[in-house]
UniProtKB/Swiss-Prot annotation:
It comes from the Bacteria. Pathway: Glycan metabolism; glucosylglycerol biosynthesis. InterPro entries: Gluc_glyc_Psyn (IPR012764), Glyco_trans_20 (IPR001830). Pfam families: Glyco_transf_20. GO terms for molecular function: alpha,alpha-trehalose-phosphate synthase (UDP-forming) activity; glucosylglycerol-phosphate synthase activity. Induction: By salt shock. It comes from Picosynechococcus sp. (strain ATCC 27264 / PCC 7002 / PR-6) (Agmenellum quadruplicatum). This is Glucosylglycerol-phosphate synthase.
Amino acid sequence: MKSSLVILYHREPYDEVRENGKTFYRDKTSPNGIMPTLKSFFANAEQSTWVAWKQISGKQQENFQAKMAFPGQENSVVHRIPLSADQVKNFYHITSKEAFWPILHSFPWQFTYDSSDWENFKQINEMFAEAACEDADDDALFWVHDYNLWLTPYFIRQKKPNAKIAFFHHTPFPSVDIFNILPWREAIVDSLLCCDLCGFHLPRYVQNFVAVARSLRKVEITRQVPVDEHAFTAVGTALAEPEITTQLKYKDHLVNLDAFPVGTNPTQIRAQVEKASTQERIRKIREELGSNKLILSAGRVDYVKGTKEMLVCYERLLERRPELQTKVNLVVAAAKAASGMRVYKNAQSEIERLVGRINGRFAKLNWTPILLFTSALSYEELLGFFGAADIAWITPLRDGLNLVAKEYVVAHGCDDGVLILSEFAGSAVELPDAILTNPYAAKRMDESIDQALAMPVEEQQRRMKSMYQAIQRYDVQQWANHMFREAKATAVLGKEPTPV
């Protein structure tokens, strides 16, 4: 039986574990993120296929099983594309992370062209399309995820002209002058214009894509509407946008556009936070700190995350306000990037250097200003810090959304706590009750941490309640529902978009 739904995602939907010479497949350990939600839609389809890549060695190639039944679900198939270590390196570690990533995040000086392997990237995207089409109905819905698979819609459209193709962009989409630095810009845009629906986190990213498309191709804007101000801040902050283009026409093909940011899973997060083991973890952290304020910064090592700027601001805080020495503690959870990700090595070294300098300058016999974790914390450990932290300091220089900010709010519910959030994180236009700051401006950063430390409990609770309610209204399930609803309706000419 052919699949009516095909999900294309660079990760497999489970963890493969070897124990005692046997292979087991287990759910991803984090209860949050989009994976559980995608899997629920995947399982509920009459017949579905999930396409991902799998790195294998030459020895494994001979006995490699490309198609596997989804554990416990006979109607679902995982189609794994075997890639060699060199293919993965060139496709993911170099071309995706050293060429595309810096452009998407508006860091053009980090862009690498010479080592990029465009032909390898094209080949792997075509392999994804071939695998996706192999078992798909002629009118199947293909849901393609993220920039790693930019070219896949084009190859699918060649093979399945009547298919519905939806694409969701999980990163920022930059301004036209930045995106057009990419030497392969025309091929990327041509592929995205093959889609029936292109989804982005924010109206700003939609408008940036429209500007790029109009700069390279003769596209017609066929529908533009005011931004839904119940969902997004329309004016007054860095990523605000008052209007959104919701449909383009190119060569008699309609491309629907929409903004619907990924949500969290508040129910699961709250259940985990309220577990006795998590509450005990929170209690122990608070007991160890005493009356000290706990500030938390969490995120992987990446030059776009603004960790360096945050650390320098913390150093200024201890200089400006010496009375806070021994009264505040900063926990930095900055997990090292996976091996092979050479682009992040300098960022890691800079973080470690700054933490060493600050601790060396200000540490007392009974107080260390910063506790740095460079190994990944378990989700349970991270939730313990979320629950214990008085302040979450999330100030990326650029971020498509930033789910950590939402997770911190959910961990606190309607209780006290303060979120400092960069204006350049996509979630800032969803969470106006955070303390929004500009990580490029030292004075604004100083003012934001001072405001957070001084905020009365009543104001903390009011702001947190407002943010928590917003996150509850548009959780990860609503995000996926929205995507499927809009994708299935794309064939209706002139259809009005459903509000977020």
